[in-house]
Amino acid sequence: MEEQDPKTPSRPDREDSTTAEGSEQRLGHYLRMLSDENPGNRWKAADSLGRLKDPRGTGPLIDALFDDDVRVRVKVAWALGSIGDPRALGPLRQLYRMERQDQQEIIGEAIEAITRTMSGE
C-alpha cells in the first residue's frame, strides 16, 4: 500500500463515491481542500470540483476565485465554467479585467461556457 504524504489531505475512498453519502464526503473533502495552505492542493480541489459539476461548489469556488496563486485562480475559473452556474459570471468578469492576456483566454472560455449553458446550447 502506498504511503501518503502527511501534508496532502487524504482522498475519500473511491468505493464510497457511488453512494449519496460517498458523494457528500467527496464534495466536502474537495471544498475543505480549497482553503488548504498548499496551492497544489487548492488547484487539485478546484479541478475535482469542476469535474464533479456539482452546483453546490459554486459559492466556495467563487470565494476562491481571487486566490493568491494565479494557477489556482485559472483552475477555479475553469471549474466554474465547467459547472455552468450563472452566479459566477460577475466575479469571472471582474477577474477577467484584472488578469493578463494569457489568463484572460481561459477565464473568457469559462464565461462563454456559462453563457452557452444559460442559452441552452
Describe the function of each predicted region.
Residues 20-33, 54-66, 85-97, 117-121:
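Amphipathic alpha-helical scaffolding segments comprising HEAT/armadillo-like alpha-solenoid repeats
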Residues 45, 76, 107-111:
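Conserved hydrophobic register position within alpha-solenoid helical repeats
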Residues 3-52, 57-60:
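N-terminal segments that cap or nucleate solenoid repeat domains
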Residues 37-38, 68-69, 99-100, 104:
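Short inter-helical turns and helix N-cap capping residues of alpha-solenoid HEAT/ARM repeat scaffolds
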